[in-house]
Amino acid sequence: MTRILLLLLGFYQYFISPLLGNNCRFHPTCSEYAKEAISMHGSIKGLWFTFKRIIKCQPFCNGGYDTVPISIKNSKPLNKKI
C-alpha cells in the first residue's frame, strides 16, 4: 500500500502539480510532506498526518516551515550511557 501511495504522489508531482502552480503555504509542499510522512510512518499514520496538513493549508493559516513529526520509537538516542 505504501509503495502505491508513493507512486501516486510521484505521478501527481510530475504531471498535475506543474499545471496547478505553486499554491502551497508551507515548506515542504503538501505533496512532499505526504511522501515524507508515508515513508516515515507507513500508509495509515502517514495519510493521517497528510490529512491534517492539507486541512491546515488554507487562507486563514499563515503557513511556514512544517516538518513531519518524528516517531519516538524510530529516533536514535542523543547520548549513550557508558
Curated annotation (Swiss-Prot):
Subcellular location: Cell inner membrane
Pfam families in UniProt: YidD
GO-annotated cellular components: plasma membrane
Keywords on record: Cell inner membrane, Cell membrane, Membrane
InterPro entries: Membr_insert_effic_factor_YidD
Domain of life of the organism encoding this protein: Bacteria
Membrane-traversing stretches: none
Record's keyword annotation contains Membrane: yes
Bilayer topology: Peripheral membrane protein
Major subcellular location class: membrane
Family of the protein in this entry: Belongs to the UPF0161 family.
Its biological purpose: Could be involved in insertion of integral membrane proteins into the membrane.
Protein name: Putative membrane protein insertion efficiency factor
